[in-house]
Amino acid sequence: LENAVDRAFYERLLSGLGGGEPTRQYEAFLKAEVDFRNATNALRLARSGADIDPAAYFIEGGELFTRGSLARLARNLDELVEHIADSQYGEELGPALRELEEADSLIAFEHATDAALLAYGDRLGTIHPVSITPIISYILAKEREVENIRAIARGKEAGLSTDEIESELVIT
């Protein structure tokens, strides 16, 4: 259900964008967000080993995957990781991909995609300071801050150690 909502949201949002340089920057940000969601979905499917059609989880609008490439790559974790590492996001996600190969957890990768998206939003905000991108960057940073505060509160309530709580935070 969550993926269907994401798919409808991004497809509608991307189809309604106008022209102009600031809009192109916003579109680039949205495409990166779609790429990160598709990468996360593909990695989840590849790691689960479940016999689920990856194309059903594909969100249109990104540049990293096509429906066919996502379906093919989600069946082979090594090829998927290599595809992401060789992409325009390889530099930002490289450390997380290495950790993903070594550890057996997607959490670090998901945190790295969140941090990379925040950093990308910050970069766009400095390129076009009189556009929507600084506002998006600010909203994303505040959203991440609230999520981190919630993680700290839940961790303390559950009696987790400081190290365990810190591993759940996304810090840029």
Walk through the language-model features, giving the residues of each:
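Extended alpha-helical surfaces
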Residues: 1-172
